[in-house]
Regions:
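Nucleotide-sugar-dependent
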Residues: 233, 278-287, 292-313, 318-331
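Conserved donor-binding/catalytic core segment of Leloir-type glycosyltransferases
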Residues: 216-233, 239-243, 252
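N-terminal subdomain of nucleotide-sugar transferases
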Residues: 1-62, 240-246, 380
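A charged, aromatic-enriched C-terminal amphipathic alpha-helix characteristic of glycosyltransferases
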Residues: 344-351, 357-390
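A short, active-site helix/loop in glycosyltransferases that binds the activated sugar's phosphate group
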Residues: 166, 170-200, 330, 386
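Nucleotide-activated donor-binding/catalytic signature segment of Leloir-type glycosyltransferases, i.e.
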Residues: 220, 260-286
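Membrane-proximal helix-turn-helix segments that form the acceptor-binding/catalytic region
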Residues: 105, 122-125, 129-133, 160-179
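Carbohydrate-associated surface elements
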Residues: 185, 204-207
Length: 390
């Protein structure tokens, strides 16, 4: 039997949506009697390390823990709490990769196929190691494209580093067996710009393996945002535009990130900012809110697609995109008519919000959300697409 290993940075009980996606896919592999295990870090985003034992993590070595998610065994390599400093965060990645390489080398006879899920972008180093050194079938799932994002957001300004990283990334994508991307736009970019073989690229959308929540009873003038508050999300720019609106909508934010403090300082009668809360708490506190903001820097087009999009849809929220009209996000919202997309620095916000006051339009959007949840947010279908790559 083909022995399969999933390798991710985050995984439950850490409360990060991308980590839960990986775990849910793995659980479906397990249900189909596939030999599947997961290698990830200890919780580092939104989790108290002192309570590891209370949440199912059992220490089995100096820097190693084990837990189970729906009968899938997870090995956790010890990691410190996530830092918002770029230098410290990069150091955390490299430290994690070093521990991963040691683990993979020692356990190389225990798996045949490895699925590697990026973030962080330096996961490409592990993909190269798994294919070239360990000679394993390697499938790399890319959810964000680097160094393009770092370059566009001016997070990395050294041409030497940018070119070096791109060469390493291209070497990775040309060397491994299969590449998974989350949008057609990213696939086309890899083919036309990065010159990656089309035959090895598969499109698999993000999804949210959660029960669909009831829609809001009333269509009120309330918007929610839940997630990361960093540079790529561009939430501060949306607040600039939102503050000029005469529509008197209210925006409630839940999250954490490098821009949290500056966003928190912008609270007003119409803007409320809260720190991160669990998904169950979020559902309860936002069940009356009909709209959800998905914000993305206008510099990002094909390089990233916010995973929270599908989580919002499972929460039955009508999407308000704030992104480049040429972005994968904007194309997705408009193609499937799931709400509106606002072009940063160009569109008049109030004219777009006016669209959301049309009852017939809202009724149709809810029907479209239902269809998308059945089509793309089905974990069985997503898992089957991954299984076909083995």
């Amino acid at each position: 039997m083909n022995r399969i290993l999933f390798h991710s940075l985050t995984i439950p009980p850490d409360q990060v949506s991308t980590g839960k996606l990986v775990a849910d896919i793995a659980s479906k592999f397990k249900e189909k009697n596939l030999n599947i295990k997961i290698l990830a870090s200890t919780p580092q985003y939104r989790f108290d390390s002192k309570s590891f034992s209370d949440n199912g993590l059992k220490k089995i070595g100096k820097n190693k823990y084990v837990s189970y998610y729906k009968n899938v065994e997870i090995t956790h390599l010890s990691s410190s709490k996530r830092s918002f400093s770029r230098v410290k965060r990069f150091s955390q990645w490299i430290n994690y990769h070093f521990k991963s390489i040691i683990y993979l080398t020692r356990n190389r006879k225990n798996f045949d196929t490895i699925f590697i899920f990026s973030y962080p972008p330096t996961m490409n180093l592990i993909a190269i190691f798994a294919k070239k050194i360990l000679k394993k079938k390697t499938i790399y799932s890319i959810w964000e494209l680097y160094p393009e994002i770092a370059q566009k957001l001016s997070e990395l300004n050294s041409n030497i580093l940018l070119n070096s990283f791109k060469k390493v990334d291209n070497f990775c994508l040309r060397t491994i067996d299969e590449v998974v991307v989350n949008s057609n736009e990213m696939k086309e970019y890899l083919i036309n710009v990065r010159k990656i073989n089309e035959e090895k690229i598969t499109i698999i959308y993000h999804f949210a393996n959660e029960k669909e929540s009831p829609k809001s009873i009333e269509i009120t003038k309330e918007i929610m945002y839940a997630g990361n508050l960093g540079t790529p999300q561009n939430v501060e720019s949306f607040l600039d535009l939102f503050s000029l609106s005469k529509k008197q909508y209210k925006l409630t934010i839940y999250g954490s990130g490098s821009q949290y403090n500056s966003i928190f300082d912008r609270q007003s009668e119409n803007i409320t900012v809260n720190s991160f809360i669990s998904r169950d708490e979020l559902l309860q506190e936002t069940k009356h809110i009909p709209f959800a903001l998905v914000s993305l820097s206008p510099k990002i087009t094909v390089e990233g697609f916010p995973g929270k999009t599908f989580d919002y849809l499972k929460m039955n929220k009508i999407l308000i995109g704030y992104s480049n009209p040429k972005s994968s996000l904007a194309n997705f919202i408009e193609k499937y008519k799931l709400g509106i997309n606002i072009s940063p620095n160009e569109d008049d916000l109030d004219s777009k919000l006016q669209i959301l006051e049309d009852k017939d339009y809202i009724d149709q959007v809810y029907k479209n959300i239902k269809e998308i949840n059945n089509k793309f947010a089905n974990v069985d279908e997503v898992a089957n697409q991954y299984i076909k790559l083995i």
